[in-house]
Amino acid sequence: MLHALLLTLSLSSQTAGPIDITEQELTQYVNQKAKYQQQYGLPGLFDVDLNIDAMQVRLGRQKANMAQVLSNGHFTLTLPGQPAVDGTITADFEAKPRYHLQNGAIYLDNFTLTSYQIKPATVQEQFAPLVGYLVQGLQSRLEQQPAYVLNTKDKEQLWLKQHVTRFELLPGKLRLHTDK
């Protein structure tokens, strides 16, 4: 709701020209719309229930034309013959933002894990094989589910969706251009 208001205010002051979507707006949208919860398991070997609780999107700060996605979550890991272990995971990813003209949506493609930390450290070794599944799951989710969508029920955003010609990634924001 707040991101729509901020974008509407931005559109009201600039009806023709570039419109910026900030990393704060992307972060808010991703946290509201792109919840990630997954269960993994191999019978007799392990079971894990993983939830990503919060993500933060940074745009063009570490690498040009790339987004950084910082995520925090929690998990429950169950191994045969051992009590279940609750823990936390912090994972950082790099992704390539893509603007889809027809949908008026921003997607995050080519997810790459750059670092992660598991607590308690005692389960790091058991959890390490699951990190690949985490990356694949998040990559699949965010390549299919937008990180941000223009609200076509709002007439200014509908106009913007119909007139965006290109986008560029700048430090801290995505700029949507309506020029030729």
Where are these regions (language model features)?
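Extracellular/lumenal and peripheral-membrane lipid-interaction modules
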Residues: 11-180
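Sec-dependent signal peptide recognition
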Residues: 1-8
